[in-house]
Amino acid sequence: EKHLETAKEWVEGEAKQIAYAEEKTRKDIYDAMQSLEYEINTLYTSNGQTPFTTLGFGLGTDWFAREIQKAVLQVRTKGLGKERRTAIFPKLIFALKKGTNLETHDPNYDIKQLAITCATKRMYPDVLMYDKIVELTGSFKTPMGCRSFLQGWEDENGNEVNSGRMNLGVVTLNIPRIALESEGNPEAFWNIFEERLAICKDALVYRVERTKEATPTNAPILYQHGAFGKRLGETDKVDELFKNKRATVSLGYIGLYEAATVFYGADWETNPEAKAFTLDIVKKMKEKTDAWGNQYGYHFSVYSTPSESLTDRFCSMDTEKFGIIADITDKEYYTNSFHYDVRKNPNPFEKIAFEMEYPQYCSGGFIHYCEYPNLQQNPK
């Protein structure tokens, strides 16, 4: 409206006035998105970390929504500074939806093409399949961070709510250690597994109870000013924001590959019995978290821990305890969650086909990650 008023003063003809206003607004949007990206990448915590922020987009079809999405992708494609460095944050996540951007006649198909071009140059955005997220989590939402998903939830009025909800924390289970302690005995494995799940349950419940001890004045922006979706008074209980499964709390896990290697050898990925064993692990975790959620009134979910540092830490600790074991501790890392062993260099189709059965049991957090050669000459 501001630019249109200026155009009416200096430009003749309604069509030219509208074109002028749109071009000026388009530049404002680009500058705003560029400022946001630079601001996030020059903001650091006391220990030198950049805030982990995530932008989800792809679905908005009105003029402003489309221009914002274009600007986000143009800024990321251009890169940071004179060196044109690839920005890590904010993490970009593009949603693919039938009727919106999947096919050539969809209104946002051109933005999807822009997203593909951006991905060939910057490895971002990540991609979400709208229908699959609804199927797995109960409603559509982009993840918190890179893979943490809220589950579908309705308030007391029957309204579906995602904004303002939160995760209260994660406790991660070292699956390879259980397998090593069992010495390849399936019965021993499941007995130890049950014992460790009980410990995880206690830790998660403690986490919830400890969080409930906060008061709204401890974090006014979150509790009193609406960041968590409601405005609490100074004396209100913060549990009002957590209970009735509004908040999630997550049971993480790591190292399905190494655990199965103990029982079936290093090349077990094509062994149906071994695959069923790993699926049983996450299936049992899912059954436990569902039961805990019904017992305590908070949404316990299974989470495929990203564990950039935990892959090293768990493996290092187990090397000290069990020594160097071929294909397990000798790598000096554990494989993330349900991922395919990267040493085998599977192509993207093999990797996704292998991993696709797991997210139904760990919808609290999952990601399929593939590395590609230079695709700039072949975006299709």
Spans of features found by a protein language model:
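Conserved catalytic cores of very large enzyme subunits
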Residues: 1-245, 266-267, 271-380
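Contiguous, well-ordered alpha-helical segments that form the cores/surfaces of helical PPI scaffolds
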Residues: 249-262, 283
